[in-house]
C-alpha cells in the first residue's frame, strides 16, 4: 500500500540557464520530487545567442512544456558544405533529409523567457541566492549544478587533475539580417577557419566563425563583414550582436560527487 505521507525527495537545481530551467521543469513533471531552482540574485542581460538542437531534443521540449509556439523553432532539412579555393567557394557536399528535420534553431532569450514563465505557472519554488559553498545546499537530498566551468562551487567537487588546451583561437558570433531566398544551414571551410551559418527565421541567421586569436589585432568588424559579403555574394545585409569568445578545452576526470 502506497504511503501517501511519504516525504518527497528534495532536489535543487543551481543555475537558471537553459539547462537549469529545462532540468527543473523535467524533474517537476515526475511529481514525486520537491524541486527548487536556485539562481543568482542579480539581473541578467539578454542571452543574444542561438542554439541548434536535434529532432529528439525538440520533441523533449514539447513533453516538458505544455504549449510551445512552433514558430520559435526554425527547422532544417538540409545542410550545405562549402570549401574555399583560391578564387571561389565550392559546394562539395549536401546533407538532405526528406522525412524529418535534421535540426532546429532557436533564439536563447525567447525560449528562456518561455521556460521562466512555465516555471512560474508550475509553481516551482525559485530561490534568488548566491551559492558560494556546497554547505549552502546541505538541506537537499540531491544537488544538480547547471553552472559554468568557472563557478567556485563547481570547481570544488571535480578532480583537480584535468586536460587543458588553449587552441589560440576565438569564436566570433553574431546575427545577420538578409533578403536572400532559400537560405540553408551551411558550413564553410574557409582558409581563416570554419564558418557555420544557422538560419533561425526567414530572413535572419546566426553565425559562428572560428579564427586565429591574432585576428583580434585587426579591425575585426570590417574583417567579418567583408568575409560574409564574399560568402553570401551580396552586401545587402545587416550584422548585429557581434561577440567573440576564446576557444579552450577543459576536460575533468569527474563531474559528480556523492549526491551532487
Show where each model-derived region lies.
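Beta1/beta-strand and adjacent pyrophosphate-binding region of the FAD-binding site
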Residues: 6-19
Amino acid at each position: 500500500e502506497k504511503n501517501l505521507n511519504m516525504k518527497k525527495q528534495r532536489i535543487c537545481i543551481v543555475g537558471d540557464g537553459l539547462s537549469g530551467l529545462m532540468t527543473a521543469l523535467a524533474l517537476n513533471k515526475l511529481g514525486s520530487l520537491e524541486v527548487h531552482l536556485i539562481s543568482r540574485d542579480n539581473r541578467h542581460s539578454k542571452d543574444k545567442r542561438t542554439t541548434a538542437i536535434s529532432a529528439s531534443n525538440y520533441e523533449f521540449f514539447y513533453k516538458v512544456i505544455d504549449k510551445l509556439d512552433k514558430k520559435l523553432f526554425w527547422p532544417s532539412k538540409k545542410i550545405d558544405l562549402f570549401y574555399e579555393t583560391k578564387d571561389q567557394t565550392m559546394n562539395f557536399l549536401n546533407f538532405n533529409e526528406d522525412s524529418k528535420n535534421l535540426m532546429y534553431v532557436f533564439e536563447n532569450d525567447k525560449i528562456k523567457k518561455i521556460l521562466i514563465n512555465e516555471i512560474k505557472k508550475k509553481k516551482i519554488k525559485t530561490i534568488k541566492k548566491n551559492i558560494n559553498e556546497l554547505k549552502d545546499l546541505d538541506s537537499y537530498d540531491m544537488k544538480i549544478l547547471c553552472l559554468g566551468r568557472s563557478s567556485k562551487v563547481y570547481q570544488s567537487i571535480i578532480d583537480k587533475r584535468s586536460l587543458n588546451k588553449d587552441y589560440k583561437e576565438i569564436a566570433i558570433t553574431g546575427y545577420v539580417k538578409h533578403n536572400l531566398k532559400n537560405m540553408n544551414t551551411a558550413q564553410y571551410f574557409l582558409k581563416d577557419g570554419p564558418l557555420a551559418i544557422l538560419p533561425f527565421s526567414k530572413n535572419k541567421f546566426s553565425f559562428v566563425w572560428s579564427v586565429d586569436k591574432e585576428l583580434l589585432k585587426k579591425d575585426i568588424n570590417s574583417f567579418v563583414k567583408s568575409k560574409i559579403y564574399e560568402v553570401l555574394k551580396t552586401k545587402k545585409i545587416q550584422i548585429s550582436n557581434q561577440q567573440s569568445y576564446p576557444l579552450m578545452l577543459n576536460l575533468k576526470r569527474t563531474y559528480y560527487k556523492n549526491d551532487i
